[in-house]
């Protein structure tokens, strides 16, 4: 098994591509850069430059609350391909899968908390950003088969510096670069 993994890594380095060691290593869906130095991943790689049309009509997959610096509430939406794959637990995600993460400032609800008599209700405040992951294993081979997009609430694309943080973080996720799971 170890020799198989080493051969796959060596082949990936030689061809300058990306290899998903998911099946060979038993680590379902992990992504690995092909060559040393590819860890920056998103630098120089193509990005998602336009928000997909109709994404607000997609199906909800999950909701997340982020503490720390982000302190946000987010909802994860998926197109039909991503939604079906996530529900079925299909890894890796098929090409054509698109995920949209809509992030909002996490705020206390004064109105709700007056009813409850204590601070316990958090709601989505102002939108902070919209992020996309588009699966195209050929176009985005340098970043695990995923293209990343980051947009302001009014649709302006993110900076190269913002986009450069996407792949290094997502390659650590054990489900083909996706942190979230389907929530029925």
Kindly label every feature range from the protein language model.
Residues 11-22:
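Hydrophobic alpha-helical membrane-insertion segments, chiefly the h-region
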Residues 71-84:
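Short, structured beta-strand/loop micro-motifs enriched in basic residues and often containing a Trp
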Residues 9-10, 89:
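Exposed boundary/loop context
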Residues 43, 81-88:
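Short acidic, Pro/Gly- and aromatic-enriched capping/linker segments at domain boundaries
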Residues 1-9:
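Bacterial N-terminal signal peptides that target proteins for export
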Residues 5, 26-37, 45-70, 90-184:
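Sequence context surrounding c-type heme c attachment/ligation sites in exported
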Residues 2, 22-23:
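Basic polycationic patches enriched in arginine
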